[in-house]
Amino acid sequence: MLNKLTSLLKDAGISLTDHQKNQLIAYVNMLHKWNKAYNLTSVRDPNEMLVRHILDSIVVAPYLQGERFIDVGTGPGLPGIPLSIVRPEAHFTLLDSLGKRVRFLRQVQHELKLENIEPVQSRVEEFPSEPPFDGVISRAFASLNDMVSWCHHLPGEQGRFYALKGQMPEDEIALLPEEYQVESVVKLQVPALDGERHLVVIKANKI
């Protein structure tokens, strides 16, 4: 699996240390193991997880501005866990409302010795925003409109929303409230992945 990951990273133009690669593989192995009992993801093959979960998450890293992030509706830690491994200087709060997912995240935190994550079981609407976050990240969580509506209290004055999407979500962008503006839409290149991937970066026009 290390050879496959190394090859994928090379194709993506991403450089990681051996320690980071080993952490990513350990995470995939844990996800594969726990998935049998906890049904954390529909992806069953660890090699497929490398593409659809690991690469699909870490290609976003260069576009994240700031040091404090919250991954809302993180599920089994996607994209938060892979991002925390490739951005060790940043801190990631991993938020999910389901206890079994948060238990898995805490086990990952323990086994991988990840000191820059905080798994939290909570609904996003009820989660406090102090101190505010530099970035609110979501992957397959909600429409853009619902994301900014439910998470409006989380980013700071210079904070941004980062929504990982498949096809270009033009309809969702058109429905955004006027107090939010799309700062950029990045077409992501994920090696060996079928289908399109886009990152939508949204800024609140906070006065």
Curated annotation (Swiss-Prot):
Its main location: cytoplasm. S-adenosyl-L-methionine binds at residues 73, 78, 124-125, 139. The keyword rRNA processing applies. GO terms for cellular component: cytosol. It holds the Pfam family GidB. It catalyses: guanosine(527) in 16S rRNA + S-adenosyl-L-methionine = N(7)-methylguanosine(527) in 16S rRNA + S-adenosyl-L-homocysteine. Its EC number is 2.1.1.170. Keywords: Cytoplasm, Methyltransferase, rRNA processing, S-adenosyl-L-methionine, Transferase. It is found in: Cytoplasm. Coiled coil: none annotated. Disulfide bonds: none annotated. One of its GO terms (molecular function) is rRNA (guanine-N7-)-methyltransferase activity. Belongs to the methyltransferase superfamily. RNA methyltransferase RsmG family. NCBIfam families: rsmG_gidB. Specifically methylates the N7 position of guanine in position 527 of 16S rRNA. PANTHER family: S-ADENOSYL-L-METHIONINE-DEPENDENT METHYLTRANSFERASES SUPERFAMILY PROTEIN. This is Ribosomal RNA small subunit methyltransferase G. It comes from Escherichia coli O17:K52:H18 (strain UMN026 / ExPEC). The gene is rsmG.
